[in-house]
Structures are given as structure tokens and as C-alpha cells.
Amino acid sequence: MDAHYAPAGFAEPPAPPASAATQPAAPAWAYEARVPAAASSPSCSGSSPSLKASYEDGHPSQSESDVLQRQTFTASHQLPGYATTPQATGMHSSAATELFVAGPLPTTGTLPPPTLSAYQHSSTFSNRNFATTSPLVLQDSSFNTTSNGILSPHDPLLQIKTSQGTVPTALAFERLGSSALSNSVPPQSSTYRSAQESAPHLLQPQFSLLPSTLGGAQQTPQAYNSALFPSSAASIERALLRECSVIKHHQRPSVTQSIQAQLTGSQHPLHSYLSSASIGNFQEPSRQSSLSCSSVRDSTQVSNGVLPQKTPQVSAELAQSYSSVIPSSGYLPSATKVDSCSTKQPLTSTTIPKPQSVIPPVQTLNYSKPLHNQSSVISGQAQIYSTAQLPSLLSVSQSQNYGLVQPHNVPSIVHSQVYRSSRVEKLPSLYKTLTFSGSSQPVTSENQTLSYSSNQQEVLSLVTNENYPAQTRDLPSVSESQNYSSGQSQGLSPVSQTQVSYSSQSQVLSVVSPSESYASGQSLTLTAPSLSYSSASRGQSLPVSTPTPSYTSMHPSPNAQTQGSSAQPQEFLPAVQSSFASSTRGQTLQSSIPSPDPKSYAERKLDSSVYTSSKQDEFPVQKLQALQSQASLESSSQRLPDGEVNAQESVYKTSKADDRYSQSVTRNNSHLEDQVVGVALQGSEQEENMVGSMTQLNQQSGQSNNAVATDLKKATNLMQTPQVRLNTKDLNQQHSLMHKMHEAKVQQQHDQIMSASSQIQIPNPALGQSHQALPHTSVLLDSACDLQILQQAGILQASLGQAKASLQVQRVQSPQQIVHPFLQMDGHIIQSNGEHPQQQLHPHNSDIMKLDLPEPSKPLQQLTTKGPFSEANPHDSKNQFVSLGSICFSEAMLLSDERNILSNVDDILAATAAACGVTPSDFSKSAANETMQDIESSDSKSHYQQSLNVRHVNSDFNSIAASVGKPQSINDISLNGNQVSVSLSSVPTLQSETVLDQPHMETPSQTIPTKVPSAMVGLGQEIQEQSSDPFKKQLTINHESKEDREIAVDSALSNNRNQEFVSNSRSISGDSVVSERDFTLVGDDTGVLVNPRRSTLALLAMPQPGDAASGKTEDEKQDVTYFNLPKEKAKGKEQGKEEEDNQKQLKRSAQCKRQNPRGTDVYVPYTSPSLESCDEGFQHQEKMRQKIKEVEEKQPEVKTGFIASFLDFLKCGPKQQFSTLAVRVPNRTRRSGIQTTRTFCPPPFAKTSPAAQAPSETGGVSLSEKVDSELKTLEQLSSFSSDEEDPGSCGHDIYKNTSAPLTVLDATSDKTKKTVLEALPVATPGASAETAGVAPTASTAVATIKQDLHLTSLTVNTMENANSTESPTAIELDSLPSDQLAKGQDTVAIEGFTDEENIESGGEGQYRERDEFVVKIEDIETFKEALNTGKEPPAIWKVQKALLQKFVPEIRDGQREFAATNSYLGYFGDAKTKYKRIYVKFIENANKKEYVRVCSKKPRNKPSQTIRNIPSKPSSISKTSDPPVSKTTTTKTPSTKPKAKQLKIKAEPPPKKRKKWKEEFSSSQSESSPEVRSSSSEDEGFEPPAPSVTRFLNTRAMKETFKSYMELLVSIALDPDTMQALEKSNDELLLPHMKKIDGMLNDNRKRLLVNLHLDQPFKNALESFPELTVITRDSKAKSGGSAISKIKMNGKAYNKKTLRTSKTTTKSAQEFAVDPEKIQLYSLYHSLHHYKYHVYLICKNEISSVQKKNEDLGQEEIVQLCMKNVKWVEDLFEKFGELLNHVQQKCS
């Protein structure tokens, strides 16, 4: 395409295949327009004016706005062809722009005749559009193949023509990656998508058909196009009808039953869809299923079976294959089909699907079947789509589609059709692959099915390699592969896969994703959004749904990609079904996101109409023929479920329209609402059913429900409508059943996607997208509706600024956030997410823009495309265009450094573009080769590669999404990303964006984007920053003024790429922020101020990637780090060394994170990821350091560029940090509002000059590397004041600022959560807004670097934390190696801060007042933060006269302790004024080191006195003072708490004995009292020398100890549980005293034992019976009278600890004859042993006497009254002393 549209800047993307090239100009333009949006970043920059003009031209007027919206939607979403697309086209040439604008504008139906003409002119491509199953897909496809130069080389449509096998995937991917993977993948994506949408498995044939006739593809688009091109509703409708009939014929041949059924059902596409979903309509699809899945009993039965039959089957299947499927009425059929697929899928790649698990098969089945169901849905859809699209693909597509669903061969198509790939994140890939498989359909199809089933790398390799082998290598391939790979390999990491799929789908769906995701509900940009919308929440879900399904898939992905996929398909299917059932309406709604689509849909009223509108929007420039085809198809689909569809559609429309309305489609809404009025009645019944099912789904999705609160009705309507469409009756029955089954099976088949769908929330949290689960289930129904509504509302809102959208956005925001990783692809979803969604959309735009970043203008264009992708098309589009204008990458943006950053942005943008349906061909172009290699390298890589490749942007995005679940993938991606980075500037941008989008997705994006995206991000970011500055401001204002999507969308559009990029990231977890920051980084010099928000977003998103890296390992948590990495890499320029690049990127991203947070006011939540990253960085300091060293060794070149500076920084400190900071400071300053709050420890950087920015990033890394040096470095930074010495504390600071954002991410890391949360309170207040804004850069950099090593899991956690705003700390902790984080401590006892007396300090250790410790005043804040977060705090110093002994922090048993060192400082003169006393407790002396811990509160002096005096207190044996004696004492009283251990400090037993003692009293506290040692040595039989007991007993300390002892005994007498409670709480007031007394008693008792040689029975009796009676009587022996003595022991046995009488039957009294001379010794021994019990009894008596005098007294009062009886206490003390003295005398 570039070749064809070189002037537009499409030159960047590889020229489309000849077929594409040869496609009519209009279609090419249409596609190009779309693709450029997604993949023509360069085009954007190159033809920025044109793009901007065309975009703005479109934007100014409502119709234009609508068009733009559509375009935006298309470009952004599955509307790659949306405004951006047209503009991209326009950018290519004004004629193209006009054409495109004209093309998309007609979608609104308000386009000027010329536009319409132009649009109609592309009616040929309309066929093409139809050929591309989804309108968007078609559009994309058209754009790609026919009108998108970007798609040219790999245009799936084109390639479908030329190479059905490979191209289909590419095509589908093209649809997906049309924006993202425009060059290679887009075509494939597009076509594939359309093929997938209509007949996923037939994609290849479809493709081949599409290129030539676009018949099959056209057919699907017909529905879509109908929806898409409502303006030409009548003609298009007629055309569609004709095409439908044609398609019917075409389809029948391939899949007679399925197609016929499809057509029949297709006639009611929604009906069919509903049927599929309901099983009733799925009959035909089922039949198809049968055909395809004859082996699959369920499918066959379903298809052949009647609805009832199908329902049971569905139930079974659902239960078995798609509990997820159940959620939506469409799901049942899906499930059913899934089963078919399952059986079938296993055929092709039984192993893989099976490995995937039951779920995989289920998923596969789900996919296949959901496909099938979707297929049916798609059948219905495909009939809507297929019908439209199937003309070419028709027989094959439909056939295959259904074949996949039903026939074995069809699986591909089924995937395609079902849009498994789209629906199922995995499936999308798989599906795409399947579609791709068109040529090698059976295997590929199976593979894809399998792939999705296996959902994992197996499939990836199988599908990706087989289906996608070339394509995987190929950009399109990669796109698919990645999508697929992502979906699949990330199927491994369900999130990854799902996300990838979704990403891919979302992106591809966005690009191709609309088609794919939609059915791919997202394949149609409109479709996907529509689907999303259509799915209601589902529509949102589509994007969300796609993302959501993706999410579902993604989240379930961990369980099973299949599961996730299934869930997605379920979600998707329901979404798709609903969507399709609502058919194109949902799509149109999606399309509607741009007003034109909804409008056109409303106009058409038909889902297909909506679809057409959507489709039209998607590739408005496609031939009107295609549109007409769509119209025909549309009419066909309308016809099929016309009543149902209409009713459902209306209902759907109503809810959707409202959503759309709020989002961006005002007129559409009106039409939709009008229709809804009529349809609502029809659908009311169904709606009720739908509502019921939706309720179920809502219940399942839970989260989404809230989001649907305002739009719940709408959502329910939407859901109902789609589902009603599915099968009004069957739907009612089956949907309910499905839902029930879905719910039941979701739980049952947690593995399965449905489960994923329902439970996706859980997986999502891993992804940091708790909403993903919602999106699936909830999205399906509630979320789907809500999301859809939200999306629409957000988009409409963005355009219309409706409050409703904001509500929806807010409500959906949670769901959306979860969905966001996928949603990030779907701008509408992002918008649904409110600000975040919008921003995510914008990041998508950004991605798209960046996609073409190789040509600075291209990113703009893509961004623009994405902007349209953002649901708020009218305003957003405008803003986006403005943004684009600004974004038109300035020279500065293209600076090498910036460029690297932009490279990252490009990656992200590319991914976003792909997600948005923008062709990523630009990106793909530059990054295709490397990307392909990378993709081949790994799934994550694959994703990354996709991201890198313009066509793979979607993949990248997908991969990111997918990689979220796969930390490994991320690393691979990172490495690949590095390569790519070098090779592709723009690709990296795409990747970056993708990554940013996926930071939530996590790893893949983290790693890959980190590498390649870096450069791209640099460019795109700068450009975006420049262009987005005003918008950013506007965004900020808007966001602040409105939380709705409109503002978010506007912002996003304003920021376009970055914003969109940000949106995606943000949506996911905070990636948005990262993305923005990323961009900010890029625009440090040129566009810092321009796009501060975006920068911030990028930064935040970057932190997210770091999290993703961590999460990848852990759970697809953070893409932030990797996002950061890409930037870093970008900065480091394209280092060949992937690892080094990764590190660089990580560092860079960390820096970016820090930097970006400054400007992320709107995206405050995303700062948290940054913080998290920072934290993680700290956690992984050592690992990072090691890694850096390794990198240096392995890749000496690494020392060049960013890494070199970073390494230097690590060596010299944070000087460099300031440069990075400086660049970002403006952004931060601008965004300081909210961003400031989120800013973390790095704020000082903000203060630093721009020159410090790069260093600051490196500084961040260095922080992570050298905690101490870093701490000092940070000290220099004002923002790191509290944690100057501790990078951890710095991270903590950052966390403080980003605590809310991090909290969102917290879900994944509970461990860290605690610490982080603890740290958060301190840190949040700590960093100043702006200062923090800057400082985070360094901190983030550190976190990023470390993340590269360890943060993957943490990153994932961070992502999740991003979702839950309170877990920043947790993430932070997670980011640090567990061994580097200690248990958090909320407060620190520092003189002047916590000097309250009479407060127990609690905790282990002995407070010794004589020990004076101090801490530097300047370190106090850092110290507090570090302790709070568990990070390494500054050292403390022990005052030793004129010297200070240094105590350094250590972690022992998870506790932060300080160990003595041999370092000393002088402590005299002025030095004394620089320190504050800090209260510590002595733990123990071990290894010749003294260990202390810092008190949280100032301890009372009493314990310390006791402890001090105990050594000197006389033991009854006079041994107490001796350490051994005290040790013995402790041992003797096991009841005494282990705290006694702390007493051990003064005297340690010999090493061997000490070890034994330690084991024995490991739990006891090591106090420096000899008692403990006494106790210990007692156990060892060590008898210490007897001290003079009298001497001790007479001391005041001894009296205090005894008094405390008595106080405790009185308490125990009142409450036997007191002792246990005190031991649990490590009481430090009373327990030490009791232990001391017990130790003394044990010590003396042992000394007596030495003199008493007791028999064991006698000894046992002495110790068992508390009462002893001496019996002496004279024996009357003949010899004279000799005294005979006996000792009688009796009494009740008691518990030695609680002193309660034992309930066990006590032995009868025992008598022992003893030596009269030793009776006194026995008595003494007995008294010592039972002394506590005896005193306890005395206390009980005293208590009873007190209670008699004073009734109604509480325990405290009684204890106080007893203790006030001084005489009583002193008498007991005297008796105690006498006892000990007596023992001493006897033993001496």
C-alpha cells in the first residue's frame, strides 16, 4: 500500500500484495485509510496535514464527525478505517483523504454526496468489506487489500486472494492488525477478520474470494456494512440482501447446511446468531456444526438437533466445553459448537486442544463451537457477515467457518466465523490462524481451533507455525501468529493469549480485531465495538468483548487459554451473538461509536444495518459495492432475524445506542432508540429473557453489573437484543439455560473460557484486570452491555460528553480496566472505562499513529485512526486530528533518542492501532522482518513481533495482552523487541503502545515493548506529546470536568497515539499512564509539554509493563516494566542485544514511568504501576545489577545508548536522571494535578533540568541496582528525601504517590500488598506532586530494570494493583525480591515523634534504656517509608560515648532488624544535632553481632529496668545473674514466652549449646537478660554458678519484676487466656518479668536437682501434684524407734501455662517413702516447681476478696486494686525471697 500511497507515508508499511495493490483505489484507500490510522503512523506524520485535515474535516461537522468517529472507531477499533483510516488515506493523498473521509462519512448517512459517492465508489470494496467478514474487518480488509496500501503486501484480503492459506490469517490479522499490522498482518487480519467474522475457517477461501470478489468477505460486511453504511442503507441494504442471497448460494456450496442454515439463520444473522447462541438459530449453524463437527457429536446434534436438543447439548457442551459459553444465550450454541469443535478440533490438533485442557478443547470447542456458536452466531453473523462476507469466502468461509464449527475443515472458518480468534483471544489467534488456515484450512483451522484449544504455544506453534508459520514469520502471519501466538502462546499465559488474542484480536480486532474480535466482534471496528456494544457490555466487551472475551480468555487463559478463549467466545459469542444477533447493530453500535455507525445502524435498524454502518465506518472507503454487499447481507441478516434482529437489534440498539450515544453516535442513537422503540417491544420479551440471562451474566460478571447500573437497562437491552436476536424463543430458553449453564459451568469448567469469563475476574486480577472476567460474563451480559453501553456512552460521551457515559465509564471502568488490556485495543471499551478507556483508546490511536511512526507523520495518522477508534469519535476524532496535527511528529520527536522512545510508543501504537483496527502495516513495514523473527522466537515475541510489525502491532498488543499471562513471553518479546527496536523504530512504537496497552497485559508487552517500542515510543511519544499537549490539557480539563468516556476519549483522541496508548495501558492497569509517560519520554525535548498527559500515561503504563514483567511470571501483572523497557530500549537505540535492550528498556521504562507520572493527572491511577515498577525495581536491584553485568558481558554494545548511560548512572549516581527528568518535567508539571499525587519518589527529578531526564531514568535503574548508593543518590533528589538511602524507600515514595494506582494493581500481589500498602500511607504523603512526578522516573527506572529480572510477576501484580487502587504497596513489595522486603512497620519510635509514655511498643526484643540509638534527622522520612514498605532503610547508630556504631539493616525471618558493624563515626560537637534518638529493642547477639529492631512506639521503661536488673537480681540459686542460669531458667519455663530469648544477649552459652538453646527457644525473644540463658542452660543440664540471691532480691528492679509478675498472675487468675494472648502479641511489659521469675525458679529448682537424686516416678509425682504432705511416724521396730518419713502427693493436676485445673482425671494421691533428711529439699523442690500455681491460687483468693468488697468491677480495676494492696504484694515478695534464699542455703 505504501508503494501505492507513498505520498501518504504508507511507504513505511510494506507494499500490499499485488492483489491489494491492484485493488481499486477506493477500496485501497478505504483500507489504507483504516490501516494508515493503525499502521500508517508514518503516513500520519508524512501526510499529517492531510490526515489531520481529513480527520478534522470529518470531525468539524457532525457527519464528518460521525465519519471520523466511525473512522476513528474503525481505525481505533475495528475501525482502523475510521476517521484515522480515511485520514490515513487522506494523508496519503488529499484525494484519498477525501475519499476516505467521504467514505467513512457516508457511514453516518450524513456524508455529503461526494463522500457517499466515494464511499459507494468503494462499494466494490464494499463487497470487499463484505468479503471481510466484519464490516470493520471488511473495511480494514478492504482498506488493507483494496484501499489500504498498508495491507497490500500482507493484506489478508489480498493475500486471501493470493495466498489463502497464509493471507487469511494475515488478513484476519490485518483486520486485527489492519491498524496494527497493516502492512503484513493487516491485510490478513482484515480479510482474515472479515473471513473470521463471517466464516473464520473460510478465511483463506474467503480471502481469496475477497481479493477478487470479496463475495464472502463482502457478505459478512454486508451485515456489517449495512450497519456500517447506514447512509446508503437502502441501496446497501438491497445490495446486502442481494449479496446475502449470493452469499447464501456461495456459502451453501461450501457449507450447505451450515451456510444455508447460516443464511437462513443468516437471513436473521442475529437470528442465526441467536440461534447459535440459543441453539435454536444455531440449528443451521449447528447443522453446519454437524457438518464441520460431525465428529463432534454436540455440534452435529446442535446443528441438526432442534433448539431443545441443542439446548441440552449446549448445556452438556457448555458444561463440558463452554461453561463460559453458557453465559450468553449465544454461548450455549457456542458451547454446543464448542463441543463440536472440541471433537473436531481434537481431530486436527487434538493434542493441542486437549493439552489446552478440557478447557482448551472446550475452549477450542468453545472456540470452535463458540465459534460455531459464534460460527452460528457468525453463521448468523457470518450470515450476517459470512453472508455478506461469504460471497467470496462464502462457501469456503461459511463452509469453513461453519465447517470449522461443524466440519473439520470448517474449524478454521469456525474460528474465523465464530471469530474465535476474536472472540476467544486465543481463538482469535487461532481463529485468525484458522482463517488463515483458509488455505491450509483443515490443519490450520484445527490448529487454530486447537491452538485456541491448546490456546497455547503448542497451538501457537501449530497454528502459528502451521497456520501462521509463514504469517507468523510474516507480519500478517505474525499478527495472527502473535494474536494467535499471543492468543495462543499467550494462551499459555491465558492472559497473554487472551490478551494477545484480544490484543491481537483487540488490536487485530481493533484493527482486525473488530472483525476478529468481533467475530470477531471486533473485526469490524464497528463490529467489534459494535459487538462490544452489541454485546452491550459485550460490545464493550468485544473490544471489551474482544478484550473482555480476551480478558476472559486471557484471565481464564492462565487456567486455559481455551477456557479464557471459551469464555471470550462465550462472552464474545454472546457478545458476538448478541452483537451479531444484535448483529451488526452491536457492531454498528460499535461503529456507532462513531456517530455515523450507530446512526447508520439506527437508520438501517437492522443489525446488519448497524453492522454495515460499522463496517462502512471500518472501511468507509471500501467499495460501496462492499457496502451494498453488506447492505444485502445486512438486509439478509436483517431478514433473517429481522423481527428478532430488529427487536433485539432495537433493544440492543437502545442500550447500545445510548452507549454509543454517550460515546459518540448521537444520530445513531436516535435511530437506534427509534428502532429500539419498535424493537424494544419485540425484544421486550426477549429482553426479559435476556435480562434474565444478563442478570445471570451480570451475577457472574458481578463487577460489570455495577458498571451497568446506569446502563444496566441498556446493557440488558443490549444483551437482550443480541440474545433475543440469537433466538427469541430459544434464546429465552437457551440463553437462560446458557446463562445458567454458563454460570454453573463457568464454575464447573473454571478451566473453560466461560469459567474464565465468569472467573476471569480472578485471572484478570492477575492481569490486573479484574474486569476482564466481567467483560466476559459481565461483558457478555451486564458488562458486555454495560461495557458496550459504556463504550458507546464513553465514545458518544467523548463526542457528546454525556454524563451517562461518564457514569457508564465509571461504572464500567472497573470492568473496563480489567478488560482494558484487551479493551486497550478497543477504544470503545477503553472509553467505556471512562478516562482510562478513552486514554486507552488514545493509546491505541497512539499506537496506530506510532505504527506508522517510522514516518513520523504515520504515527499521527495511526493515532488518528486510533482516535476514531476511540469511541468518542466526533469530538475525539477532532481532538485526535488536532492531536495528530500536533502529533505530526516533529523533528525533535524523531530524534534518535526520542525516536527510540517513540519506537516504544510506536510499538504500543502499532499494537493499539492493531487493536483499534488500524492497519499496522507501517509498523509492520519497519518492524516486520525483525518482528517476524522475534515472533518466531516466542509467543510473547510473536506478540511482540506483531506489535513490532505494523501488522503485528495488534499482535504485539495481543501479545502484550497475551503476554500478560506469560512472563516468559515478555522476556522473549523483550529480546525480540530489542531486535525489533533496532530494526523498527515505528514498530517499537507500535510495540510500545501495544505494550502500554498491555502493560496490564503485562509481560509480553513489557518485554517486547520495552525493547523495540522504546524507539518507537520515543518518536510517537514526542510527536504525540507535541500534538497532544493542548489536548492533554484539554484532556485533563475534560477528564477533570467529566469522567465520562467523552472526555477520556477526547483526551485520548487529543493525545491520539499516546493518549490512546495511554488509554489502553491505563485501561488495563495503569498502562495508559505509562503509555502517556512513554510518549512524554519521547516528547521530552520536543513534545514534553505537548503531551504531558500522554507521557504520564506512557510512564504509568511503563511501570505497568514492569509489573507485567513481574506479573508475567506471576500472573501477567505488569507490562509496565516492559513498557519502560521499550522506552529504555528506544533510548538506548536499537541495540542488537535483546537482553541488554530489555534491560535498557526496563530502565528506560522505569525512567519513563517516573517521568511520565509527572504529567499524568488524569491518569493518576497508572502512576501506581510506575511506583510498583519502582518498588519492584528495588526488589530486583541485585538481579538487575547482575543482569546488567551479564548484558554488558554478552552485549558490549549495550554500553552504548541508554543502557550505557544507565550503567554509567549506576556507577556514578543519578546525574543522568535529571536529564530524563528535565524532559519529562514539563509533562509532569503540566500534569502535576493528579499526576503529582501519583508521582513517587522521583519527584526531585521533575525539579531537575531536562538534561537530567535520561540520567534520571538510568538513575532509577541505578537505584534498583545499588540500594545504598542509590539511596544516597536519591537523597540528592528532593523527592527521595524520605527514602534517600533506600531505593526501596524511593520506590515507596513513588508508591506513595501512586498508591491509588498501585492499589489497583495490588490484586495479584498480596504479599507485597501488605508491605506496599504499609509503605503507601507513608509514601503517598511523602512525595510532592511535581517532585514526585519527576522522581518516579528514577525510581521507576530502577523498578523497571529490576522488573526485567524479577518484576514480571510483580508487574502482573502491579497491573492488578492498578485495578484495585489500594495495592500499590503490595505491588511495590512484589517488585522487590521477597528476600529484600521485610515486614512493614507502620510507625517508628523516634524521639520527638512518638514519645508517648505508657504505650506498649509491642514486638520482639528487649528494650534497654541504657542503649541509645540514633538516626540521621535527614534520614528520618526515608527511614519511616522504608520500614513501612519493608524496603531497606538507612542505617542507625548506637551511641557509645563519643562514637556512633553503625547498625545496618538486615532481614531476618521476614523482620527488619539492624546488625552491628565495625563502622564508627564521631559523635560530639555539632554531630549531636544531626541525629535524633530512635528507640530500639535488643533482639540478640548472634554471630558476634548485636541485633536490634526499631520500635514502633516508644517502649516503657519498666521492662528495660527489669531486664537490666534481672542479671543482677539474685536467683534463689544465685545463678540468675549468670547467663547460663538465666538460660536455664528460660528453659525450665516453657510456659514463659519465647521472648525470654531476647534476654540472652548478656551471656551466650557455648556455641554448641547456644545452637541447641536457640532451637529450643527460637520463638522466644532474645532479651539480654541472663534469665533466658538460665532457662536454656537448664535444659542442657548446664548448671551456672549460684549468684547470691539475696543480693538480687533486694533490688528495686527485682521488686518491679516481681510486681509485674504478680500483676500478670492476677490477670491470669481473672482470665486464663491472658497468657496466651500476651504471648501471641509478644507482650513486652509483663511477659519478660514473668519469664525472669520463672527463670529464677527453674534455675533454683535445677540446682536442687543436683543434690536430690530423684527417681523418675517420684520426680514426676512431685511435679504433677501441687499439694505435698509430709507424713512422719515413728516405727515401732524392735530395734528401737527409727523415724519413717513419707511424702504424700495429691491435688489436681493443672495446666502449667494457663494454670487452669486439668480436666483430665487426676491420678490418685501417691505416697513415697523418703529419706527424712531430704524431706526439706523435696519440699523446696516442690515449692519451686509449683510456686507460680501457688501464687496463682493466692491471687484468686485475693481477687475473690476484692470482688466481695467491690462488685461490678472490670478486670483492670480488679488488677489495679489487687496491686494497690502493697502489703500483700510485698509479703509475697518476701516469701519469694525467702524461698530462693532457702534453696541457696541448701544448695551451697
From Swiss-Prot:
Segments of skewed composition (Basic and acidic residues): 1126-1136, 1545-1561
Polar residues compositional bias, start-end: 60-69, 478-492, 532-569, 576-594
Cross-link (Glycyl lysine isopeptide (Lys-Gly) (interchain with G-Cter in SUMO2)): 1112, 1137
Keywords of this entry: Chromosome, Isopeptide bond, Phosphoprotein, Ubl conjugation
Subcellular location, record wording: Chromosome
Main subcellular location: nucleus
Function: Plays an essential role in the protection and maintenance of transcriptional and developmental programs. Protects many bivalent promoters and poised enhancers from hypermethylation, showing a marked preference for these regulatory elements over other types of promoters or enhancers. Mechanistically, cooperates with TET1 and binds to DNA in a common complex to inhibit the binding of DNMT3A/3B and therefore de novo methylation.
Subunit structure: Interacts with TET1.
Protein name: Glutamine and serine-rich protein 1
Organism ancestry: Eukaryota, Metazoa, Chordata, Craniata, Vertebrata
